[in-house]
Regions:
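Outer-membrane beta-barrel biogenesis signature
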Residues: 1-12, 17-21
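Transmembrane beta-barrel architecture of outer-membrane proteins
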Residues: 5-7, 45-49, 102-106, 120, ...
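Residues on the lipid-exposed face of transmembrane beta-strands in outer-membrane beta-barrel proteins
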Residues: 10-12, 50-54, 107-111, 125-127, ...
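Outer-membrane beta-barrel pore domains and translocons
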Residues: 11-17, 67-71, 112, 126-130, ...
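Extracellular/periplasm-exposed beta-strand and loop segments of Gram-negative cell-envelope proteins
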Residues: 18-46, 70-103, 130-154, 182-187, ...
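Repeated loop/turn-to-beta-strand initiation elements of outer-membrane beta-barrel proteins
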Residues: 60-64, 117-119, 169-173, 205-208
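Solvent-exposed loop/turn segments connecting transmembrane beta-strands
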Residues: 117, 180-191
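Surface-exposed extracellular loop regions of Gram-negative outer-membrane beta-barrel proteins
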Residues: 159-181
Length: 252
């Protein structure tokens, strides 16, 4: 059977971002602010990613897996247009320091309903924990103002579909998609996580891989007393990033 019992993978991911942030009560500002163009955040970032997988039982149809990556960015910019947040207008020329940090921590259980020596396809359920922090420090002629967005951790449940295909001996094609949409009281959230890549296993316990990942996350809080865990802010985050990742893999 070509499907591993367990594995640990680690490597680098070069991500390219498009992010929009909003602060405060809906209708009291200019709407979403582009974090890269207007607020000076880097549009690309190289991060370390780690993941682990284990398949209990002899059939190896059940699978538990985990992954982690941290995306921390800060920027400096001079406003090129007026922005309004909570009915306060900050003029062209104001100096803005921005912080936008988040982690993606994912755990998933899946079951392979189709598995043979060449193909493995599984369905599952996952949970994403997303520690999130974003804020602005705006300097005008009148002084400094710190505008807080959020500093919280959001749990996002997701459905998962996984596929592994043995192309030739030791060469595999892997694909996975996880997604969710949820609207509850003062919270609305959506997530799409798409991965596809090739993996070469020249030795029994060692492999290397190259893949592509796209991820889009949108979370919006409209009240500080929501029933949804972690929603203690008023604002919206809409972040999309994609890029290539290269990794090594230890299997057992």
């Amino acid at each position: 059977m070509p499907w591993e019992k367990g594995a640990v993978a680690f490597g680098g991911f070069v991500a390219f971002f498009s992010s929009d942030l909003s602060f405060g009560v809906e209708g009291s500002g200019t709407g979403q602010l582009n974090a890269e163009d207007l607020l000076g955040l880097d549009s690309d970032l190289t991060v370390f990613r780690v993941g682990a997988m284990y398949r209990p039982g002899k059939s190896r149809r059940n699978q538990l897996d985990f992954s982690y990556a941290s995306y921390d960015r800060d920027g400096n910019a001079t406003l090129t247009e007026d922005i309004t947040i909570d009915n306060v207008t900050y003029p062209v020329g104001a100096q803005v320091k921005s912080v936008f940090d988040f982690d993606i921590i994912r755990g998933t259980y899946s079951y392979a309903f189709w598995q043979n020596d060449s193909v493995r396809v599984a369905l599952g359920l996952g949970i994403y924990a997303v520690p999130l922090r974003y804020e602005l420090d705006i300097e005008t002629t009148g002084g400094n103002t710190v505008v807080e967005g959020a500093d919280t951790t959001l749990p996002l449940p997701a459905l998962a579909l996984r596929g592994e295909f043995r192309l030739v001996n030791r060469l595999f094609l892997n694909a996975a998609v996880e997604g969710m949409y949820l609207e509850l009281n003062d919270f609305q959230g959506s997530l799409l996580d798409l991965n596809v890549g090739v993996e070469y296993r020249p030795w029994k316990h060692l492999g290397v891989g190259l893949g592509y990942n796209f991820m889009g996350v949108n979370v919006e809080g409209t009240g500080s007393n929501s029933d949804y865990p972690g929603v203690d802010f008023v604002g919206e985050v809409d972040v999309r990033f994609s890029g290539l990742f290269l990794y090594g893999k230890l299997s057992f």
